[in-house]
Amino acid sequence: MSKVGTSDSKNTLYCSFCGKSQHEVRKLIAGPTVFICDECVELCMDIIREENKSSLVKSRDGIPTPKEICKVLDDYVIGQNHAKKVLSVAVHNHYKRLNHQTKHSDVELAKSNILLIGPTGSGKTLLAQTLARILDVPFTMADATTLTEAGYVGEDVENIILKLLQAADYNVERAQRGIVYIDEIDKISRKSDNPSITRDVSGEGVQQALLKIMEGTVASVPPQGGRKHPQQEFLQVDTTNILFICGGAFSGLEKIISARGRSTSIGFAAQVLAPEDRRTGEIFRHVEPEDLLKYGLIPEFVGRLPVVATLEDLDENSLKKILTEPKNALVKQYQRLFEMENIELTFADEALGAVARKAIERKTGARGLRSILESILLETMFDLPGLEGVEEVVISREVVEGTARPLYIYADRSDRAVESSASA
């Protein structure tokens, strides 16, 4: 049994779980007869999160409830509540539909594939990746920009089903109940409204190829990839019950929506007259199928995506939360890097706000946060390994704005705060 240990000479306290001394950890929390360090507390929290994730509350059909799916999404994805609700309900209904079909074959429910529309860095891909972690079904992601029509250089559409089959360990039955996320779907829009003698093999051609597998067909899938092994036997995979989620930034779609608003006399026209004064995500809320057609998606393809969820631009508060709250938050990652040098990295709240505002100004969303932090911390990370006695580095708003340098706090408190290399 682990005992609370104290050094005979210095009365040093030790963690009752890992045995580290109070000098090796940041915090040592005292109980009636035991001590626990901050590292063990964090480890316990990780274990509890994993157990909660794996024990989702089930509905009567044995399917995770929409609220439970949404709750787990909340743990990883900041904001985008509407999109999370749409995804949670769609995934729940998808598997409820499959169970319903097996019990009542006389009633056939149509499949509702999903289209996610949102600005760059708003969380479309992260939502799909998080779904993969919380659902016990095969899941795969595909990049629409790599797809071409069969017979041309690039990936065949059937390769998407092959990846799903691989995710299911070649269990065809499981693969037929999986989920496919196709990213950058806006990049396969038709290049021109006018028919051309030049075949559009990566735009409209890919849309045509995707139609059948999205609606439901028996696809012949080569287990090793068809182009390199043409003589192999094909596996037959029915795509009727595979849920397809497509996502894209649809850059320029907001102009089409705004133009439609200016040409109509209905009430919401006044709301879109000045798109430069509004954020892209707000304009996306008013998207209609006709806007997607003008953007370059063919009518049949739009019809295969009946559920449209729009994501909003992330505001300053959401970006600040993204920096600090998720399990793998960027600030936590950089703090871990500094811990390897036995240095504590501290961000002032105003500094986090300044980082968020920079990302908003650049219109890069959450995707641009890492590059901003990297540029702020570059000189510090360059200097620190060669310095001795630095205990803490403090990042203020002025540091982010470029008007000051990070503060170095030394172990010798008589010279408590020293500006970085500028004062050296």
From Swiss-Prot:
Subunit text: Component of the ClpX-ClpP complex. Forms a hexameric ring that, in the presence of ATP, binds to fourteen ClpP subunits assembled into a disk-like structure with a central cavity, resembling the structure of eukaryotic proteasomes.
Domain ClpX-type ZB: 3-56
Name recorded for this polypeptide: ATP-dependent Clp protease ATP-binding subunit ClpX
Keyword set includes Transmembrane: no
SUPFAM superfamilies linked to this entry: Glucocorticoid receptor-like (DNA-binding domain), P-loop containing nucleoside triphosphate hydrolases
Organism for this UniProt entry: Bradyrhizobium sp. (strain BTAi1 / ATCC BAA-1182)
GO BP, sorted A to Z: cell division; proteolysis involved in protein catabolic process
Pfam families, sorted: AAA_2, ClpB_D2-small, zf-C4_ClpX
GO cellular component: HslUV protease complex
Gene: clpX
Signal sequence coordinates: none
Residues that bind Zn(2+): C15, C18, C37, C40
Lineage: Bacteria, Pseudomonadati, Pseudomonadota, Alphaproteobacteria, Hyphomicrobiales
Alphabetic keyword roster: ATP-binding, Chaperone, Metal-binding, Nucleotide-binding, Zinc
Binding site for ATP: P119, T120, G121, S122, G123, K124, T125, L126
Family note: Belongs to the ClpX chaperone family.
NCBIfam families, per the entry: clpX, PRK05342.1
Function: ATP-dependent specificity component of the Clp protease. It directs the protease to specific substrates. Can perform chaperone functions in the absence of ClpP.
GO molecular function: ATP binding; ATP hydrolysis activity; ATP-dependent protein folding chaperone; protein dimerization activity; unfolded protein binding; zinc ion binding
